[in-house]
């Protein structure tokens, strides 16, 4: 995987181009996921994202796929600005922190309704982040005091199915675990959806012509 930071630069024109938009609560791990994939470095300090974009290139079947990865702000203050970054999205990554049940609930209660309103028909992948913290004793004990527990893989998978997501994946940006697989899946889903829509339009046009 070859990645390059975007500082206003455009993705190369050769090969396929895919726009990936990350959505989720502030602090859920989506920025770290993007930065580890695009730059190979985990950010040790948390700085709330406004809006960021990175370019990265994947090789799929020997051909380059250029990803435009948009990281959106999850804070309420940016509710009016966030929809400006949805147009032309090819795939949406709805992210949550597996150690934060509230961010998990917000995928179905907040983020799914928002993206389906602004991005009708765009495929969704649900991503559980920070899986390395599932076994953090201090964090788990703090959750137990509130009668809570980390979100399990099966709960994440079931929720993803309930919102009609095409896939559910988990990752740890800190450990670089499954990070590339998330974006590989995003690229494959986006390109598959694009091919499906192309042939559907061709079929519809043929039917209209007969």
UniProtKB/Swiss-Prot annotation:
A lipid is attached at residue 207 (S-geranylgeranyl cysteine). One of its GO terms (cellular component) is early endosome. Gene3D superfamilies: P-loop containing nucleotide triphosphate hydrolases. Widely expressed. PROSITE patterns: RHO. InterPro entries: P-loop_NTPase, Small_GTP-bd, Small_GTPase, Small_GTPase_Rho. The modification Cysteine methyl ester is found at residue 207. It comes from the Eukaryota. GTP binds at residues 24-31, 71-75, 129-132. Keywords: Cell membrane, Endosome, GTP-binding, Lipoprotein, Membrane, Methylation, Nucleotide-binding, Prenylation. GO terms for biological process: actin filament bundle assembly; actin filament polymerization; cell projection assembly; fibroblast growth factor receptor signaling pathway; focal adhesion assembly; lamellipodium assembly; positive regulation of cell adhesion; positive regulation of cell migration. A motif (Effector region) lies at residues 46-54. Residues 208-210 form a propeptide. It is found in: Cell membrane; Early endosome. One of its GO terms (molecular function) is GTPase activity. Belongs to the small GTPase superfamily. Rho family. Interacts with PAK5. Interacts (in GTP-bound form) with DAPK3, FILIP1 and WHAMM. Interacts (independent of GTP-loaded status) with ANKFY1. Involved in endosome dynamics. May coordinate membrane transport with the function of the cytoskeleton. Involved in the internalization and trafficking of activated tyrosine kinase receptors such as PDGFRB. Participates in the reorganization of actin cytoskeleton; the function seems to involve WHAMM and includes regulation of filopodia formation and actin filament bundling. Can modulate the effect of DAPK3 in reorganization of actin cytoskeleton and focal adhesion dissolution. This is Rho-related GTP-binding protein RhoD.
């Amino acid at each position: 995987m070859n990645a390059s930071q975007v500082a206003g630069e455009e993705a190369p024109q050769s090969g396929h181009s895919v726009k990936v938009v990350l959505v989720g609560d502030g602090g859920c791990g989506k920025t770290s996921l993007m930065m580890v994939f695009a730059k190979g470095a985990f950010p040790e300090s948390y700085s709330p994202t406004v809006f960021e974009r990175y370019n990265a290139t994947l090789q799929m079947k020997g051909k380059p796929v250029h990803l435009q990865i948009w990281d959106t702000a999850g804070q309420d203050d940016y509710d009016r600005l966030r929809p400006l970054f949805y147009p032309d999205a090819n795939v949406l990554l709805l992210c949550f922190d597996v150690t934060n049940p509230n961010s998990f609930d917000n995928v179905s209660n907040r983020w799914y309704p928002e993206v389906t309103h602004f991005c009708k028909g765009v495929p969704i992948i649900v991503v559980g982040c920070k899986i390395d913290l599932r076994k953090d004793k201090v964090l788990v004990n703090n959750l137990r005091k509130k009668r809570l527990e980390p979100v399990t893989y099966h709960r994440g998978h079931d929720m993803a199915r309930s919102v009609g997501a095409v896939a559910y994946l988990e990752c740890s940006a800190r450990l670089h675990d499954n990070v590339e697989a998330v974006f590989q899946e995003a690229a494959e889903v986006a390109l598959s959806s694009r091919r499906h829509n192309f042939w559907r339009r061709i079929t519809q046009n043929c039917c209209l012509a007969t």
